[in-house]
From Swiss-Prot:
Keyword Secreted: yes
Organism: Candida albicans (strain SC5314 / ATCC MYA-2876) (Yeast)
Encoding gene per record: EXG2
Propeptide residue span(s): 457-479
Domain of life: Eukaryota
Classification via SUPFAM superfamilies: (Trans)glycosidases
Signal peptide: 1-21
Annotated membrane topology: Lipid-anchor; GPI-anchor
Entry PTM: Predicted to be a substrate for cleavage by KEX2.
Protein name: Glucan 1,3-beta-glucosidase 2
Gene Ontology terms, MF aspect: glucan exo-1,3-beta-glucosidase activity
Gene Ontology CC: one annotated term: side of membrane
Length: 479
């Protein structure tokens, strides 16, 4: 009987070990076909809140606009209204101080030391050419040029990202002009044509001459527009074709041109990139004329953005659900025909960072206006200094970060974290996450994720199975 039990226990241990091994070693092969296409594996970070203001990244800039007797209702909600409130002279002074102080070459050295190999630098159209009547001030372009030099000196690639278009392409404050729910970029041909004009200037400056010769191995490409929301898709496709053709005609270097997904489903852009054409109907003198716009797309990357905090169901999810969401999302990208990156993601498990949703707006996590969902919890636990976070909080964040690092690296051409640093929004702050042991160093130094499996969860499953088996053995012994 004893010999039988020993054999049974050995078999049980082998079974549990096999279960754990299967869980730990499971991996997706969906990117194997894509891997041969990869020329450069992106491990990057966005320089957010610098050349295009975002209130939650640098709230001090916005708070400093208040005069005696004013309240938060008098705060500007974006860069457009920041400049309008202060006037051109004062806005230029404050923005120049901001551009000078927020980033310098030391930051780019630290970015390299953190294991990153590229930066994505957002900039607005107004930094190249304003529209008549715009309150924006110029000057940020000079700091983009400095950032390219700093990147070159520290062996970092640069993606230049047109983050704001005239009359806002998405209504978000990160476009320069907040008008939630009412992006107006496509409302007038003038706005789209002005965007073409700005892109042509960008292609001319950064794709020819000095930059083409001295920085051709630094400037990896240009993203023609960030996050267009609810556009007329045929018009957006026309814009992508025309922008691409301008880029290839003007530039003397064959760098990458990035198309942002425009919040479309994964795989949406595959057929468009394969066909490289769109039929366009124009009206002239009361008569409709249909033409076909074409492009021979080469060296295109689709830029996907993914966050887990901008719906009520997401902020109510537990960490295990978030991890499963990431696995499913990345697996779908791995099946895309187009080359793709996850060009924005973060460590955020809540939308608690003050002003993340916009100046004067609350959070889904707390169910505060304008959100009407049930309260999930208190933001105080997440907005306190990360050195005061509990061990469980830090572990959960690290599990979430590790899963994204692994899955995006495995199933796409890489990733770009949003963003390098903030004044206090830790979930969005790569530098702070490194300092607090949440962002792995080196970047593949995973504690909890092994080959795409959350081992903390897998260990619990194996432990529970072992407990049940041992209980079964004890019953046999008693019998």
């Amino acid at each position: 009987m004893m010999l039988f039990l020993i054999h049974l226990m050995a078999l049980c241990c082998m079974f549990v070990a096999e279960v754990a091994c299967e869980q730990f070693n499971s991996t997706s092969n969906s990117s194997s076909a894509q891997s041969s296409l990869i020329d450069f594996q992106y491990k990057g970070v966005s320089i957010g809140g610098w050349l295009v203001l975002e209130p939650y990244i640098t709230p001090s800039l916005f708070n400093a606009t208040l005069s005696s007797g004013e309240t938060w209702t008098d705060l500007p909600v974006d860069e457009y209204h920041f400049c309008e409130k202060l006037g051109a002279k004062e806005a230029e002074k404050r923005l120049t101080d901001h551009w000078e102080s927020m980033y310098n070459e030391t930051d780019f050295k630290q970015i390299k030391e953190a294991g990153l190999n590229m930066v994505r630098i957002p900039i607005g159209y107004w930094s190249f050419e304003k529209l008549e009547g715009d309150p924006y001030v110029s000057g940020a372009q000079d700091y983009l040029d400095k950032a390219i030099e700093w990147s070159h000196a520290n062996d970092l690639k640069v993606m230049i990202d047109l983050h704001g278009a005239p009359n806002t392409q998405n209504g978000f404050d990160n476009s320069g002009l907040r008008n939630l729910g009412y992006p107006g970029w496509q409302n007038k041909t003038e706005y789209v044509n002005h965007t073409y004009k700005v892109l042509q200037q960008m292609f001319q400056k950064y794709g020819t001459g000095k930059y083409a010769s001295d920085y051709k191995n630094t400037i990896i490409g240009i993203e023609v527009l960030n996050e267009p929301l609810n556009p007329n898709m045929d018009k957006l496709k026309e814009f992508y074709i025309e922008s691409y053709n301008d880029g290839r005609e003007i530039q003397v270097i064959n760098n990458t041109i990035f198309f942002q997904e425009a919040f479309q489903p994964i795989g949406y852009w595959d057929s468009f990139l394969e066909k490289g054409e769109i039929k366009v109907t124009e009206t002239s003198n009361g008569t409709n004329h249909t033409t076909t716009k074409k492009a021979d797309f080469k060296n295109i990357i689709i830029d996907h953005h993914h966050y887990e905090v901008f719906t009520e169901s997401q902020v109510a999810s537990n960490v295990s659900t978030h991890l499963e969401n990431i696995k499913n999302y990345a697996s779908a990208i791995g099946k895309e025909k187009a080359k793709a990156i996850v060009g924005e993601w973060s460590a955020a498990l809540t939308d608690c960072a003050p002003w993340l949703n916009g100046v004067g707006l609350g959070s889904r996590y707390e169910g505060t206006a304008p959100y009407t969902n049930d309260r999930v919890g208190s933001c105080a636990e997440f907005n306190k200094s990360p050195d005061k976070w509990s061990k469980k909080q830090k572990k959960d964040y690290r599990r979430f970060v590790e899963m994204q690092l692994y899955e995006y690296s495995t199933n796409s051409q890489g990733w770009i974290f949003w963003c390098w640093k903030t004044e206090g929004a830790t979930e969005w702050d790569f530098r702070a996450l490194v300092k607090n042991g949440i962002m792995p160093q080196p970047l593949d130094n995973y504690k909890y994720v092994k080959n795409g499996t959350d081992t903390s969860s897998a260990s619990a499953i194996a432990s529970n199975k072992m407990t049940l088996l041992l209980a079964f053995l004890l019953v046999i012994l008693v019998i």
